[in-house]
Amino acid sequence: MNGIINVYKEKGFTSFDVCAKLRGILKQKKIGHTGTLDPDAEGVLPVCVGNATKLCDLLTDKDKVYEAVLTLGIITDTEDMTGEVLERRLVTATYDRVLEVVEQFTRTYDQIPPMYSAIKVNGQKLYELARQGKVIERKPRTVTIHAIDILGVTPLEEQPEIVHEVRMRVSCSKGTYIRSLCRDIGEALQCGGCMKSLIRTQVSIFTLENTLRLAEIEECVKNQTLEQVLMPVDKLFLSMPKVVVKKESCKFLYNGNQLVEDNFTWEKVSDQINIDKIRVYDSEDVFTGIYEYDEKKNCYQPVKMFL
């Protein structure tokens, strides 16, 4: 069994929990997720099965899209509403001011990750140190916020012109902590803030609309319809030209050797002008790997094999 399942991670589960449960449901040991979601977050969690686990790092590096709710005026130790409230501040931000500040974060900037995170410092995870009551200096990490769209705001009841909560869609690079983005926006508004809720809506080509909950996957196994929801590995690489290796040259392919153009045929003649990366199939049309053109040696070298 090889492929990728677009799992809807529900609240209360860690990403590790999801993989552990899937091992039981699928009776498959080789399973890995493609980027941690906090236990209280929910949404898209692509899970790789079988030889697709070789893609875990590749998918972790992809851009992501989230929908988050930012609550202004509250500062917590975890940077979300699950933590201990450290401070409450007066909020004076109007919608126009919120819009102005949010737009300033659509850029590349150095973000300080939260103490409650799985980042390791001197071999220890930050959240382990945080639980011991320790707060240590964290190195900023460069992240890119591609876009922030404000989907709606909730005003203060007693002052309707003042914003209490902001619901926003964030498109960002790998390594971005939305909790920390909420913290930073709150600080820029001079009232502080923390994340109330988080849903991941997209990772690469995987979207919220096509996710399956664990119970639904279990049902697919019972009904023997799992193949319908297990995405083939090669679907991630459809933008690359396809080549089929000739039968007599498959021995080179199976051994992970370099290939020259005489070893294969192009699916489309027009694809030959794009000679950067190709997706390679054996003579039986079984997807086998990704190769990259080596200009110095005038051949294609294996990048990732899925044998």
From Swiss-Prot:
The enzyme's E.C. designation: 5.4.99.25
Active site, per annotation: D38
BP-aspect Gene Ontology terms: mRNA pseudouridine synthesis; tRNA pseudouridine synthesis
Class in the EC hierarchy, top level: isomerase
Alphabetized GO MF terms: RNA binding; tRNA pseudouridine(55) synthase activity
Signal peptide residues on this chain, from the entry's feature table: none
Function of the protein: Responsible for synthesis of pseudouridine from uracil-55 in the psi GC loop of transfer RNAs.
PANTHER family xref list: PSEUDOURIDYLATE SYNTHASE TRUB1, TRNA-PSEUDOURIDINE SYNTHASE
Annotated protein name in UniProt: tRNA pseudouridine synthase B
Species annotation: Lachnoclostridium phytofermentans (strain ATCC 700394 / DSM 18823 / ISDg)
GN (gene name): truB
